[in-house]
Amino acid sequence: MASGKAAGKTDAPTPVIKLGGPKPPKVGSSGNVSWFQAIKAKKLNSPPPKFEGSGVPDNENLKPSQQHGYWRRQARFKPGKGGRKPVPDAWYFYYTGTGPAANLNWGDSQDGIVWVAGKGADTKFRSNQGTRDSDKFDQYPLRFSDGGPDGNFRWDFIPLNRGRSGRSTAASSAASSRAPSREVSRGRRSGSEDDLIARAARIIQDQQKKGSRITKAKADEMAHRRYCKRTIPPNYKVDQVFGPRTKGKEGNFGDDKMNEEGIKDGRVTAMLNLVPSSHACLFGSRVTPRLQPDGLHLKFEFTTVVPRDDPQFDNYVKICDQCVDGVGTRPKDDEPRPKSRSSSRPATRGNSPAPRQQRPKKEKKPKKQDDEVDKALTSDEERNNAQLEFDDEPKVINWGDSALGENEL
C-alpha cells in the first residue's frame, strides 16, 4: 500500500479519524464494584477530590437526568516489611442508589463520600445501572468531557481495546498528570521526555506476553505475507519487513533507533494510533489507481489531523521531526556518551589511589516469605485491594483524551 501527502488541493473534505472507545453496558449488573476505574490521590491524607466539571464520568448510555452519583473513598494498603503500609487513597464512582452507599439519598452527608451531578440531572432518581461483576466485566476508562479532578489526583491509562487478559497492561501505563487548565480540560498534559514515550511500547509487549505466543513460523509469516498486510513481529528490525529506510519517497519513516528496535520503540506504538484502519484508508482516502507493466498500482492518500490542543500534540510533532526522513540519524539523547574520568592525567603509580580496604561482609537477614507478608492483610483488605487493578506508581505518560488515548491499536 502506497501512502503519501496529497499532491494538490482538492474540494473533498480532509478525512479525519473519529476516535472512540467502549462504554458501560446499558443493562445493570449484579456485581458489587464500580463500573469505572479509580482516581488515585498522589499523596497520603489528600483532601477529597474537587472537579473542574460536573465530576460525573462520561456515559452516553444514560440520559442527562440520570447523570449523578457519588465518589467513595477506598483506603488502600500494601504488604511490606513489618506489616502492611498505607498508600494514597483511591476514589470510586457509583451511581446514586448503587454501590456501598446505595441506601443514601443524593446529597446525604457521610464521611468519605463526594456527591456529583451533571447538568440537568434529576438527583431524586435512583439508578438501575447497578454495579460491576468483576468476573464478567473489566473496569471502564474514565473520560470527563467537562473537566476531571484537581491536580491532587491521577488515573491510569487503560487501552480501550484491552480484553480480560490485559489487566497488567494498564498497570505498566500508570501516569501522573499536571493540574488541569482551561485549555486542556479534556485531557491531561505531561512531560515529553523520550524515556516516557519509550515506555508506551510496553502496552503492545505486555499484550503479546499475556496473549498467545508468536512462534518462529508465525513471525516469519507475519514478515513475509503480502507487502500491504505485513506487520513487524517481535525482535524484527523494520528493514527486515519493509525494506531499507529512505528519504523523500516511500519508506521514509523511521530513524536508525526505530529501525533497530522495531516495535520495542515506543514511538512506533504512539504513531500507530494515528495510522488509519483498513476501512478508513479505503473509504476516507483519495484513491488513485494506475496500470503499470508489473500490475495495478493503488495509491492511498489519507490525512490524520492531530489538533493543536491535543495533550500529546508536542510529542507527535517531536516524533515526526525525528522519524520522517530519519534514516542515518538517532534521537539526541540516544547518542553514546563518552566515559568520564575523574582526572585528565593518565593514572600512574605515583598518583594512583591506594587500594580500598575491604569491609567485612554483614550477614544478611533471611527475608520473610511471601505468604508470611500476605498474612499482614486482613480478608477485607485483600478483597478491597482486589478491586485496585492498577496500582503502579506513575512512571509514564497519561495519554488521557488524546489521539493515542482514544484510538484502538
From Swiss-Prot:
Residues annotated with Phosphoserine modification: S190, S192, S379
Annotated segments matching region Dimerization: 226-333
Where located? Virion; Host endoplasmic reticulum-Golgi intermediate compartment; Host Golgi apparatus
- Renumbered to this chain, the Low complexity biased-composition regions fall at 15-31, 166-179
Q: Name one GO molecular function term.
A: RNA binding
Q: Could you name the domain of life of the organism this protein comes from?
A: Viruses
Q: PTM per UniProt?
A: ADP-ribosylated. The ADP-ribosylation is retained in the virion during infection.
Annotated segments matching region Disordered: 1-31, 44-84, 164-196, 238-258, 326-409
Keyword Transcription regulation carried by entry? yes
Q: Family assignment?
A: Belongs to the gammacoronavirus nucleocapsid protein family.
Q: Does the entry annotate any disulfide bonds, and if so which pairs?
A: C320-C323
Q: What protein is this chain from?
A: Nucleoprotein
GO cellular component terms, semicolon-separated:
host cell endoplasmic reticulum-Golgi intermediate compartment; host cell Golgi apparatus; ribonucleoprotein complex; viral nucleocapsid
Describe its function: Packages the positive strand viral genome RNA into a helical ribonucleocapsid (RNP) and plays a fundamental role during virion assembly through its interactions with the viral genome and membrane protein M. Plays an important role in enhancing the efficiency of subgenomic viral RNA transcription as well as viral replication.
Report biased composition (Basic and acidic residues) as residue ranges: 180-192, 247-258, 368-384
The residue ranges of the CoV N NTD domain are: 31-156
Q: How does it assemble?
A: Homooligomer. Both monomeric and oligomeric forms interact with RNA. Interacts with protein M. Interacts with NSP3; this interaction serves to tether the genome to the newly translated replicase-transcriptase complex at a very early stage of infection.
Residues annotated as domain CoV N CTD: 215-331
Question: Pfam families per the record?
Answer: CoV_nucleocap (PF00937)
Q: Where is this region: RNA-binding?
A: 29-160
Residue list for modification Phosphothreonine: T378
